[in-house]
A protein has these predicted regions:
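P-loop NTPase Walker
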Residues: 1-71, 168
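Conserved helicase NTPase motor core
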Residues: 21, 29, 49, 124-195
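Class I S-adenosyl-L-methionine
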Residues: 31-34, 38, 83, 138, ...
Length: 195
């Protein structure tokens, strides 16, 4: 298990706990991991960083760009923007709520898998309509100076590619990275972790 690997690294190889990063998919899993680690280490608090992909990437962006909660687009704001975009683009919709959820998921798929918008085929509307919706959604989001949850991953990737000194800082900080449920990560998560 990950907890036994962490204990092994610390006790056998004398790795400093501060150099270990554990990434999970949910806050609940992160909390469980911290509890199990504390129990495995005889109830001692160990300064291993444990968090979700979004939490860790947001922390990096917050440190680099001084972002705060005011920069995060809520789900409600996201759907409000998409509702306006769909109306302005005159996209035909049968069930608005389902359509909004599906379009938001497709936008997330593009970002999470670093797909090309030009070759992406939407299951919900024509390619031209989807590209128009995507571009206007992105323009509206940027105008508000906000990022959505998927942007946290994309921006972290772009940050590390464009600013090697920032990447180097985080590589030195976290020399050991362990991922819970590694087989479930998406392309952008993999690309950032691999760096």
């Amino acid at each position: 298990t990950i907890v036994s690997r962490i204990k092994y690294l610390i006790e056998k190889y004398k790795v400093r706990p501060e150099e270990i990063l554990v990434v999970t998919f949910t806050r609940y899993a992160a909390g469980e991991m911290k509890s199990r680690l504390c129990a495995a280490m005889d109830q001692r608090e160990i300064p291993v960083t444990v968090g979700t992909f979004h939490g860790i990437y947001y922390g990096i962006l917050r440190w680099t760009y001084r972002m705060g909660p005011q920069n995060i687009l809520s789900e409600e704001e996201k759907y409000q923007i998409l509702r306006g975009v769909i109306s302005r683009q005159k996209v035909e919709v049968f069930d608005e709520e389902d359509f909004l959820q599906d379009i938001a998921a497709e936008i997330g798929r593009i970002k999470n898998n670093r797909l090309d918008i030009e070759s992406f085929v939407s299951e919900k509307c024509s390619a031209d309509a989807f590209r128009a919706v995507y571009r206007e959604y992105e323009a509206q989001r940027k105008k508000l100076k906000k990022i959505d949850f998927d942007d946290m991953l994309v921006l972290c990737y772009e940050l590390f590619v464009s600013r090697p000194e920032v990447l180097s800082r985080w590589q030195k900080k976290f020399r050991y990275i362990l991922i819970d449920e590694f087989q479930d990560i998406n392309r952008i998560q993999y690309d950032v972790i691999r760096m």
